[in-house]
């Protein structure tokens, strides 16, 4: 009866230890599942393989005694998978951290190159626009100066032609210059004799003698 009581007591202790160990390992399994699937699978296999071994050792220990089972209790807790998972977790972010700065540097270099190319293209476009504007301004000034020079030449030619022409002094001169009256007509001769400086130089006697001669010539023609 004493052996049976000890056996039951050992079984009760082992069940409590197994329950505590399983409750402690469950959060570890869930944490490993969040970090990586492969690590969780390996830890589950290790935990499942170790629990039967613990049960086997516990089954053997009742024959030995209560002291041996007490010494075997600390062996039931599995600290090794936690260390392995922590190393996996610490190693994977470190790799990502090492790879991220290089990608950032490359992206920064590409953006800098793009900005430099855009600045160069904008500068060249500005230079081309300034050159075109300067050329158009020069062409406009050249055309303006050429028109001014041509206008001055035309005005000078008109003035020279007007100076070369003789302006008519009276209506008779204008008609004679235009060719409406012949230069040898009697009316033109009479008007020229009666007007001008010749009339002032002639005396009254000379005029009467000339008239008498003309009158005599007219009577002779009638006879």
Curated annotation (Swiss-Prot):
Membrane topology: Single-pass type I membrane protein
Keywords, ordered alphabetically: Glycoprotein, Membrane, Phosphoprotein, Proto-oncogene, Signal, Transmembrane, Transmembrane helix
TM ranges: 126-151
Stretches with biased composition (Polar residues): 40-60, 83-102
Region (Disordered): 40-109
Cytoplasmic topological intervals: 152-223
Extracellular compartment segments: 20-125
A single GO cellular-component term on record: plasma membrane
Pfam family for this entry, one: EVI2A
Cellular location(s): Membrane
Signal sequence bounds: 1-19
Residues the record lists as Phosphoserine modifications: 197, 203
Residues the record marks as carrying a glycan: 28, 46, 55, 120
Entry's family note: Belongs to the EVI2A family.
Disease: Expression of this gene is altered by viral integration and this altered expression may predispose cells to myeloid disease.
Function: May complex with itself or/and other proteins within the membrane, to function as part of a cell-surface receptor.
Name of the protein described by the UniProt record: Protein EVI2A
Gene assigned in the entry: Evi2a
């Amino acid at each position: 009866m004493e052996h049976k009581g000890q056996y039951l007591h050992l079984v009760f202790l082992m069940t409590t230890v197994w329950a505590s160990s399983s409750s402690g390992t469950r959060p570890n399994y869930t944490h490993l599942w969040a970090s990586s699937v492969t690590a969780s699978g390996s830890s589950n296999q290790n935990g499942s393989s170790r629990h039967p071994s613990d049960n086997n050792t516990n089954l053997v220990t009742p024959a030995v005694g209560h002291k041996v089972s007490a010494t075997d209790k600390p062996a039931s807790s599995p600290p090794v998978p936690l260390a392995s998972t922590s190393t996996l977790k610490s190693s994977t972010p470190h790799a990502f951290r090492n790879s991220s700065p290089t990608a950032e540097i490359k992206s920064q270099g590409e953006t800098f190159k793009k900005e430099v190319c855009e600045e160069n293209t904008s500068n060249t476009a500005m230079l081309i626009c300034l050159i075109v504007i300067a050329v158009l301004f020069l062409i406009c000034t050249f055309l303006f100066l050429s028109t001014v020079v041509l206008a001055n030449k035309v005005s000078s030619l008109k003035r020279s032609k007007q100076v070369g022409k003789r302006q008519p002094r009276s209506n008779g001169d204008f008609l004679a210059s235009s060719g409406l009256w012949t230069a040898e007509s009697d009316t033109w001769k009479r008007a020229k004799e009666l007007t001008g400086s010749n009339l002032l130089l002639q005396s009254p006697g000379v005029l009467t003698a000339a008239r008498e001669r003309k009158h005599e010539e007219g009577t002779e023609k009638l006879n």
